[in-house]
């Protein structure tokens, strides 16, 4: 009766959240949010992280999209269940468009904040997200968590 123990969902204490590799190709930009299991047991993630950029009184929330602009992520039918052994990482890609003459958010520099799927702790992962005419202008999107690493 001592069979394998089913993995439990990752909790706040199980995860280290950080910014990962980014790419730039005008006007599309992308960056990864990395989730690393720092716990002592296997856990799972599934779904979309919460992602927002806070600039003064403006908060720009990322829209959840299954497959992004870039077309280089796995074609998904639904968000996968990602199993993380201790020390393993998964990621989600944030994508946005730079200004190409359309109306933009108010110009400023903000903080990217993220919350892992099905958890409650929000973490600031970047202090230099530019919005408005010189930065994130529209179409801020977040893709679901997938296993592995992005862009390396």
Residue ranges and their predicted role:
Residues 1-25:
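Low-complexity, acidic Ser/Thr/Pro/Gly-rich terminal tails and inter-domain linkers that flank the onset
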Residues 46-84:
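The feature marks short-to-medium sequence segments in extracytoplasmic or secretory-pathway proteins
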Residues 121-152:
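Acidic, serine/threonine- and proline-rich intrinsically disordered appendage/tail regions
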Residues 33-40:
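Asparagine-centered strand-capping/turn motif at beta-strand->loop junctions
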Residues 98-123:
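Short, surface-exposed ligand- or partner-binding patches at beta-edge/loop junctions that are enriched
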Residues 81-95:
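Short Pro-Gly-centered flexible turn/kink motifs
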Residues 26-32, 106-109:
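Short, solvent-exposed loop/turn segments enriched in Ser/Thr/Gly
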């Amino acid at each position: 009766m001592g069979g394998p123990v089913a993995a439990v969902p990752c909790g706040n204490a199980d995860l280290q959240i950080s910014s990962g590799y980014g790419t730039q190709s005008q006007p599309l930009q992308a960056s990864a949010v990395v989730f690393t299991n720092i716990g002592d047991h296997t856990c799972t993630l599934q779904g979309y992280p919460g992602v927002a950029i806070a600039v003064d009184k403006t908060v720009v929330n990322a829209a959840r999209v299954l497959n992004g602009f870039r077309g280089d992520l796995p074609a998904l039918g639904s968000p996968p269940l990602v199993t993380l052994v201790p020390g393993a990482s998964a990621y989600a890609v944030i994508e946005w468009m730079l200004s190409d003459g359309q109306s933009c958010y108010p110009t400023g520099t903000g903080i990217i904040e993220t919350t892992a799927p099905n958890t409650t702790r929000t973490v600031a992962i970047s202090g230099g997200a530019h919005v408005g005419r010189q930065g994130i202008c529209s179409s801020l999107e977040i893709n679901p968590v997938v296993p592995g690493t992005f862009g390396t």
